[in-house]
Amino acid sequence: MSSTKAPVPPTQAEIQQIQDQLIKARDAFQVHETELQKLSASRSKLLTQLNENEMVKKEFDLLESEAKIYKLNGPVLFKQTKEEAENTITSRLDIINNNLKTIETNFKDIEKKAMEQRNKIFEYQNKIRSLTAPPPPQAQ
């Protein structure tokens, strides 16, 4: 005669502890999702700026070296040499590209953290399901 022990049902405290962990993981996931949305919006803005500045650079390439270029600063137009204007655009493009690289790196890091939290959420949900599921019928 073999003695099979029935599984010990989980206590309400154990289930509550897992639910608390689930809530913490969900909250962390939501924070990461919000950060990803902000980074995505920043990336879109930078891509627009990059496109605009690249178009300006192409326009400068078409100009003669002695062309008159004016820079708008508030309500006043200031005369600029082509070289100064090209240097300004080049430095803007460098800054934008560096910012894009930073955003891409941050996006990947946060996306990885969000996936880890999502996996934890699934893990906790499965634990809760397995603990609260009715026991299988006993074979006789």
UniProtKB/Swiss-Prot annotation:
Query: Which biological process terms from the Gene Ontology are attached to this UniProt entry?
Result: chaperone-mediated protein complex assembly; protein folding
Annotated coiled-coil segments of the chain: none
Name the CDD domains on file: Prefoldin_6
Q: Does the keyword Chaperone apply?
A: yes
User: What are the record keywords, sorted?
Assistant: Chaperone
**What Gene Ontology terms describe what this protein does at the molecular function level?**
protein-folding chaperone binding; unfolded protein binding
Q: Name one GO cellular component term.
A: prefoldin complex
* InterPro entries per UniProt: PFD_beta-like, Prefoldin
Q: Which family does it belong to?
A: Belongs to the prefoldin subunit beta family.
Looking up PANTHER family in the UniProt record yields: PREFOLDIN SUBUNIT 6
What quaternary structure, including any partners, is listed in this protein's UniProt entry? Heterohexamer of two PFD-alpha type and four PFD-beta type subunits.
Q: What does this protein do?
A: Binds specifically to cytosolic chaperonin (c-CPN) and transfers target proteins to it. Binds to nascent polypeptide chain and promotes folding in an environment in which there are many competing pathways for nonnative proteins.
Protein name as it appears in the record = Probable prefoldin subunit 6
